[in-house]
Amino acid sequence: MGLKTGIYSGSFNPIHIGHLALANWLCEFEGLDEVWFVVTPHNPLKKKDDLLDDSLRLEMAQAAIDGYPKFRVCDIEFYLPKPSYSIDTLRTLSRNYPNRDFYFIMGADNWQLFPRWKEHEKILQDYKLLIYPRLGFDISIPAIYPNVKKVDAPLMEISSTFIRNAYQADKDIRFFLPEGVRPYYYKI
């Protein structure tokens, strides 16, 4: 059995304290050894128009986790064909890191869309999934999916969209952003 490594894929547009709190909770209370923040250049189910620059999102993610040994930023999707599909990311990571057991971290909102994902049945078969709560989304996991687990992480309704909108409305959002991210974000 390898290192239990959570794969937390996202646009991180920008990364915020909700992302970090969830990842920390998964390490401390679900027993993950590490969480890798996989910055996604293009989620096939979202518009790319609203995304901050790829390299800026990657830099902000790195600044957000700086000094925390259980977190790592991963840019693997920058080198894979676009748009980014989770099955391709997971396969590549599994090949490159055979001594790790990968756990795919997903919100309840994405769990409801999961049947639309590329090769979702293969993900269910080959990887463990950790589904965290999101306000307004039920987490129903059929018994036929033994690799899928609902986690009881605290509900934090902070989103990157909320942060971008608040920033554009000239609101003080400093406490929603990790300290290392603030200098980057206020320059945008």
Swiss-Prot record:
Class of enzymatic activity (EC top level): transferase
Tell me any Pfam family this protein matches.
Answer: CTP_transf_like
User: Known EC number(s)?
Assistant: 2.7.7.18
Q: Which GO terms describe its biological process?
A: NAD biosynthetic process
Q: Which InterPro entries match?
A: Cyt_trans-like, NadD/NMNAT, Rossmann-like_a/b/a_fold
* Pathway participation: Cofactor biosynthesis; NAD(+) biosynthesis; deamido-NAD(+) from nicotinate D-ribonucleotide: step 1/1
Keywords, alphabetical: ATP-binding, NAD, Nucleotide-binding, Nucleotidyltransferase, Pyridine nucleotide biosynthesis, Transferase
The GO terms this record gives for MF are: ATP binding; nicotinate-nucleotide adenylyltransferase activity
Provide the catalytic activity annotation. Answer: nicotinate beta-D-ribonucleotide + ATP + H(+) = deamido-NAD(+) + diphosphate
Query: Which superkingdom heads the taxonomic lineage of this protein's source?
Result: Bacteria
* NCBIfam families assigned: cyt_tran_rel, nicotinate (nicotinamide) nucleotide adenylyltransferase
- Alphabetical list of PANTHER family matching this protein: NICOTINATE-NUCLEOTIDE ADENYLYLTRANSFERASE-RELATED, PHOSPHOPANTETHEINE ADENYLYLTRANSFERASE
Family from the record: Belongs to the NadD family.
The UniProt function text for this chain reads: Catalyzes the reversible adenylation of nicotinate mononucleotide (NaMN) to nicotinic acid adenine dinucleotide (NaAD).
Name this protein carries in UniProt: Probable nicotinate-nucleotide adenylyltransferase
Q: Which organism is it from?
A: Parabacteroides distasonis (strain ATCC 8503 / DSM 20701 / CIP 104284 / JCM 5825 / NCTC 11152)
